[in-house]
Amino acid sequence: MNYNKAVFEAAYGTSKQLPKDENIEFAFSGHSNVGKSSLMNAIFGRKALARVSSQPGKTVTVNFYDVEGVKFVDLPGYGYAKVSQSDKKRWSDLVEGYLMSDRDIRLVVQLVDSRHVPTKDDIQMINFMIDNEMPFVIALTKCDKLNKSERKKRENAFMEEIPCADQITMMWTSTETGEGISDLKEIFEDLACDEEEKA
């Protein structure tokens, strides 16, 4: 895949608007301001293709990006305290509507801030994917903010804090240093190649 060819395709505000699509999809999920858009921009090798929000929780849309026919999907961030109950319900309906629809979602990249204990919403999302047998990896973001000993401490803590941690692929990522970006691309390439071989 040539990630430099990534283009913004569309944004959808309700599950009914979501396109019926048979293309491979990779989705990105995480707390508001955990760095989803920044991570996607790093993968695409672009500075500002994925929209980085200065007002977390304001925009509740599922944003689709196309890379040579493969879809990269930015799910709206969750857990922002200042949104209304109606917006929270809209978020829930939209995200669940996307994840539970008949789509070819090959992988969900679940972002968790590497510096902190996973939030209640993070754990809820992880359990949702486990319960529904969805393929996912956890990207531990902003790892450049941790020194070696802090990283080891958080690594051990995550094994206790995250359900089924020993069965989940977790990777350190940083959009500042580029750590983990090539590893994620390799996973995407492998999953896309698997599909081409089946065809």
Regions found by a protein language model. Name each.
Residues E22-N23, N41-I43, S86-K88, I123-N127, ...:
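Short, glycine/charged-enriched secondary-structure capping and boundary segments
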Residues Y3-S15, K145-A199:
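Canonical P-loop GTPase G-domain recognition
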Residues K58, V70, G77-Y80, R115-V117, ...:
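Conserved nucleotide-binding/hydrolysis micro-motifs of P-loop NTPases
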Residues V67-I105:
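Conserved nucleotide-sensing/catalytic segment adjacent to the nucleotide-binding pocket
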Residues M1-K82, K198:
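Conserved G1/Walker A P-loop phosphate-binding module
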Residues K88-S92, D102, T119, I123, ...:
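Amphipathic alpha-helical transducer elements in NTP-driven molecular machines
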Residues G45-L49, S101, D131, D190, ...:
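Conserved amphipathic alpha-helical interaction elements at protein-protein interfaces in regulatory
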Residues E96-I168:
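Conserved C-terminal guanine-recognition region of P-loop GTPase G domains, centered on the G4
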